[in-house]
UniProtKB/Swiss-Prot annotation:
Belongs to the Dus family. Dus3 subfamily. The keyword Transit peptide does not apply. Signal peptide: none annotated. The lineage of its organism: Eukaryota, Fungi, Dikarya, Ascomycota, Pezizomycotina. The active site is at 418 (proton donor). Gene3D superfamilies: Aldolase class I, Zinc finger, CCCH-type. Residues 1-111, 202-238, 261-285 are annotated as: Disordered. It is found in: Cytoplasm; Nucleus. It comes from the Eukaryota. GO terms for cellular component: cytoplasm; nuclear periphery. This is tRNA-dihydrouridine(47) synthase [NAD(P)(+)]. It comes from Emericella nidulans (strain FGSC A4 / ATCC 38163 / CBS 112.46 / NRRL 194 / M139). One of its GO terms (molecular function) is zinc ion binding. SUPFAM superfamilies: FMN-linked oxidoreductases.
Amino acid sequence: MEGTAQNLDVEVPKQDLPNGTDSTGEPPLKKVRLEEPASDQQNGQAPPRLKGVAPIKAEFLIPKPKQGQAAVSSTDDAAEAAAYKDREDEKKGKKKKTTGQNKNRTFGRSQDSKGLCASRVYSPEFSPAECPFGDKCRFEHDLRTYLKEHKREDLNTFNGVCPVWSARGKCDAGWKCRFVGSHSIERVTEDGRKELVLVEDEERRKKAQPVFPSAAEDGTVNTTSPADKIALAKRQRPTPRADAYSDWLDLTSKELEKYFHGGQQNKDAHPDTAQDKEEKEENRATYTEAPFMPSEKRRLYFGPETPALAPLTTQGNLPFRRLCVELGAQLTYSEMALSMPLIQGHKPEWALMRAHETEALPPTVSARASVVQDYDNSKDMKFGAQIAGNKYRWVMKATEVLSSLTPNLRVIDLNCGCPIDLLYREGSGSALLDAPSKLEKMLRGMNAVSEQIPITVKIRTGTRDNTPNAQKLVERLILGGHEASMLNCGPSGVAAITLHGRSRQQRYTREANWEYISETAALIKRLNEKSDEVTDTIREPEERMRPNGGKTWFLGNGDCYSHVDYEDHIKNAKVDSVMVGRGALIKPWLFEEIQAGQYLDKSASERLAYVEKFARYGMETWGSDEYGIGITRRFLLEWLSFACRYVPIGLLEYLPPKINDRPPYWRGRNDMETLMGSHDYRDWIKISEMFLGPAHKDFKFEPKHKSNSYDTEG
C-alpha cells in the first residue's frame, strides 16, 4: 500500500469497524508485554536510538513524500488554553500567512436549513403545543415539511439507531434528531389519518437511571440552573464571604504598607530579645483580624494508584474525560474557566463545570489511603474545577459561587501555569508566578470562602528558563509569607500543589525537568515533616490552619507517556502522584497501562472503538441533532489532531516511547492503522464520518496549524 501516516488517501470502509475487525478484516492485535530494547528481527541487532526521533522499525519506514508535512508541535499550547488564545485579536495590518497557527479560529455552524418550532419538537404531529408567536414565527410548523425539506436525511451509522435513545430510552433532540426514524412511528388515528409520533423505551429508561444521587436525568452533575445564571448576570446573587474577606485583604494591605514604610520590618524579622518578640506581638495586635476562619475541608488523598488527567482546555471536555475515567483515570479536572465570566453568569463558562456522574464517584484507592488522618473515601470524588484570574476579589467570588452552585467538586484548582500571552499580559496564569504575595492572598482567600472544598494550585518552574522560582513559591505557600507572619493568619491553606516541569518561556519545547520536580518533592517532604526545623521559626504555621492535618500533597506533571515514565516519577522523583496531559490525548489508554504495569499494543480497531465511544458520548452530551453532531465532530477532530501522533508500540525498535520524539514517515500494519496515524485533515474528516456521517455544508474546521485547515464546499 502507498502513502504515509502523515499524508494518506484511502477508501473508508463501510462496514461497522469497531465490532472486532479492522479494515483488512483481521481480528484485533493482542495486547502484549514489550520490554526495552525491541530487537531487529532481520539484522539481529537494533540500530542505535537517535535522540528526538521515534525509533520505528525499518520495515515500517517509507520514503519522504514530495509534499512537505506541517509540524504538529505547534498545537501543544492548545492543550493549555486554546479557547482563550483564540480570543486575542492578532489582526495588525500584516499580510495573512498560509503557515503558522490559526489564532482566530471559526468553525462555521451546523444547523437545519429552517429550524423546527420549539412547540413542535417533542409533540405528536396532530397535537402540537401552542406557539406563542403564531403566524409571525420564523420556524417551521409543519412537521412533514420540516422532515422532508429542511432537515438532512437520517444517518445510517450506529446501525441507524440513535445512540442517545439507545442509552437512555429517550432522545432529547426529538424530531430534530438525525436518527429520528429509530424512535418514531407512523400510527393510524381513529379517523383514519396517519400521524407521526415519537416513542420512548421504558425499559431502557429504567436501566439508565443515574447512579449518583444528585445527578440529572442525563447522568451529569454540577448543572447550574438558568435562574442562577441570570441572577449572576444581573448581580442579584450576593457573595458575602468573598466581599468581606476581600475588604479585609484591602485593609490589611494598607496597614502593612504603613508598617513596611515605617522601617520596622528589619527589626521584627529577626527578634533577638524577649523585648523584641514582645514588641512584635504588640504590632500583630494592631492589625485587623480576619472576619472569619476557613471552614474545615474534606481530607484529600493522592497516591500512586490515583493518576490524574490534567485540565485540558478544549480537549478536556466531558466526553473525553468520561472516556479517560472508563480507561482508569482516577482524578479529572474541568477545562480552565475564567473567574470574571463565571461571576457574570456566562453560560459557556458554567458549561465547563458539568461532569459525568462517573466523575462524581470516589476514586479507587489502596489501603494506604486509610493512614491519612480523617480521609473518607466514600465522600471523595474524582472531578475538580480549575479557574484562572488576575484579581483576588474575582477568584474569591468565583470560588464562593462554585462552592454553593456546584458542590460536587473534589477541589477548586487555581491555574498559575498557563503560558498563553493573552492571560499572561492580563496578570493571570503563569504571570502569578512572579507575584508571590498576590498569589498567596488569592489562595488564602479562596480557602476562606470555599466551605468544605479544598483549594489546590498548578504552577510551572517559573516564567523564564534561567530563573526558576517554584521552590521559593512552594515554601511560601506551605509556610506563609512574611506578611502572613505579621498578620498571624497562618499559611495559605493550599491542599495540593502540581508542578509542571517547564517554564513559561519554554512552553512545550525540550523535555520537562523532572530533576527539578524531584528536588521540589524533597523540599515539600521536609516542610511537611519537619516544619519546626525551618530557619525562620517565627513563620512556623499553626497545625489547625494547615490542610490535611499538616500534609500538602505534591503532583508532578510533564511528558508522562507510558507506565514506565509514571513508575519512574513515583519511585525516583518521589511525587505523590502524576498528572497526565498530552500523553492522555495521544493515547487515552495510558491509564490502563499504568494500572496493568505494562505496554498495551492497541490495534487499529480497538483505537477506532474509542473514537466510536467519543462520538456516542459527544451526542449524549451535546445532542444528536444537526447542531449537536456538529459540536461533537468539532471536538472529535480536536482530539484526533493529537491522537494522530501515536506511533503503535509494535512498530518501535526501542522502548519506552518518548512524547517529544518526532517520527519519520511510516506506514501501519494495515490500512486503518495508517489512516489513524495520518496528520492530514482530510483523513480526520473521514474518520469522523464513519460515525457522524458527512459533514454539514456550512461546517468549517480550523486546526491550530493553518496547513491542516478544512472547509466544506457547498
